Amino acid sequence: MKNNIITPQYNCNGTFLRKNRSFVCRKGRITKSQLQAIEKYWLSIGIDFKLEPLDFTSVFKNSAPVILEIGFGSGESLVKTAANFPNKNFLGIEVYKSGIGSCLRLAHYSGINNLKIIYHDAIEVIDQMILDHTLSKVQIFFPDPWNKKRHHKRRMIQDFFLIKILKKLNNDGILHIVTDSKEYNFFILNLIQNIDNYINLSKKRMCFEHFKYRLVTNFEKKAKLSGNKIFDLIFKLKK
């Protein structure tokens, strides 16, 4: 498994170009079992980042719909969802190695064969590895809201990002975002309103308080215990 989660870029003078990213590069804690899972299962479940598009039919050995999840954390929800929907393929992207190790371990012991994961920056993966009109759904559950105003530029959900996702969805494709931040919820809704090709499936309610087909994540359980309201934002690609 390659350890670089971003592709270094330099200007003509050789100076490293720093970009605003939605995550902080840090080593963090990783357990022995997570490291062992990476060593044992990465070759069968993981996909190394490459500057070339994926052929999903070749990757999954079938032509079933592909669902992309960005930032899957420990992978518990992603693995359970993949197990519950064996007729769909799942691709997960995560930038923290501990989450990669945890997800690999869970996926192996679940015995599923419809899940692949990538350890890299999601925007680079979307730009370089995902062909247009190949995803049936993109789900982003509890992205970092970067609550301080001066940090809003770090938020993953920006207008340019939503347009990137739009191009990757196939006809009737779905974008599903979940947040426990009321301010981030309205921030996203305001962005979506200025992009013509998204239909808000929640219609007059503007957002779902809960989406019955989504599994509850550990993060969501903690958010509810803290008294936070959960917002499910679901948008469909306009034909």
Swiss-Prot record:
The coding gene here is trmB
Entry's Gene Ontology molecular function annotations: tRNA (guanine(46)-N7)-methyltransferase activity
Q: How does it assemble?
A: Monomer.
Q: Which reaction does it catalyse?
A: guanosine(46) in tRNA + S-adenosyl-L-methionine = N(7)-methylguanosine(46) in tRNA + S-adenosyl-L-homocysteine
Protein name per Swiss-Prot or TrEMBL: tRNA (guanine-N(7)-)-methyltransferase
Q: What organism is listed for this UniProt entry?
A: Buchnera aphidicola subsp. Schizaphis graminum (strain Sg)
CC terms in the record's Gene Ontology section: tRNA methyltransferase complex
**HAMAP family on file:** tRNA_methyltr_TrmB
Q: Which top-rank group of organisms is this from?
A: Bacteria
Q: Which SUPFAM superfamilies match?
A: S-adenosyl-L-methionine-dependent methyltransferases
Which Pfam family, any one of them, does this sequence belong to?
Methyltransf_4
Residues involved in S-adenosyl-L-methionine binding: E69, E94, D121, D144
